[in-house]
Amino acid sequence: MSIVNEIGKEGLKRYLENCAKVADIDIEDAFKVTVNCIKAHDGASINDDDMRQMKVLENRWYASLNSETPDYSVYSDPYYFCEVWMCWVKYSRRYLKEINSFKSMSGRSIVDYIGNIDNVIDLGCGFGYTTVGMKELFPNSDIYGTNVKDNYQYKMATELGEKHNFKIVENITQIENTKSSLIFASEYFEHFDRPIEHLIEVLEYNSPKFMLIANTFNGKAIGHFNEYKHSTNRYNGKEIGRLFGKTLREYGYETVDTNCWNNRPAFWEKKSSSKSPLAKFLMD
């Protein structure tokens, strides 16, 4: 069975059972909280008490932003697993299906367009399901996922990697082949208060041929920021999104037209080896 079919109540139960192997979490309670969070995400009216643990985490995160001391410990809370499952069900799973659909490029898939490639990096791979999906789509490629080391998600993804033949690392500098073929980043760059600087780090070190990116800088979620920084300036979500695209274009990337819903993930291909000097970005 393909990983994209790992959804629904049974899929969630299996997921939480695996979570309980690495973290102290009440499976029954987490199941209810996760289901209610998904319903709320879809527009249903859900009492905050029925998803209390997630509301506590969300309030803790945004309170820390108000004091300008981001509380990154939220990622180590066992109930953050609920948030990550919702992201899988509502977003990254759909992106995997989109890029493998023959409809995504009017008669052929994005995967077909990319063709045979050496390696793929899944930035911010969560608990590893999207990385499994990448291995299914590119079975002959070396697949890597990145995540913060020693948190619960890293442990789960590492175990999946051993089972499905991919490797989890803390950051891309630990990957020996610095020129990757494809980088996939789903709801990743929003978790950095300086996403442009981080994007530049990725491009300077890696310079992939293709990038599949789904950003929601305007979206409210645990780990997202109210505003973003670049150099000495501050930007709202819409502004940083425009600057993100500008940066990619300056590095020689162009968007490839697709039929993906709402252009997510955006498909970028490196067309030119020239780029503006790094100093230009840092001074903008």
Model-inferred region functions:
Residues 188:
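Hydrophobic adenine-recognition pocket in adenosine-nucleotide-binding enzymes
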Residues 208-217:
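Conserved beta-strand signature within the Rossmann-like core of class I S-adenosyl-L-methionine
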Residues 191-192, 220:
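Short glycine-rich, flexible loops that bind phosphorylated cofactors or substrates
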Residues 204-206:
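Conserved helix-to-beta-strand junction in the class I
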Residues 118, 181, 209:
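Conserved acidic residues
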Residues 184:
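A conserved beta-strand element that flanks and buttresses the S-adenosyl-L-methionine
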Residues 2-178, 199-200, 217, 221-284:
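Conserved N-terminal segment of class I S-adenosyl-L-methionine
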Residues 192-202:
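A short, conserved alpha-helix within the catalytic core of class I
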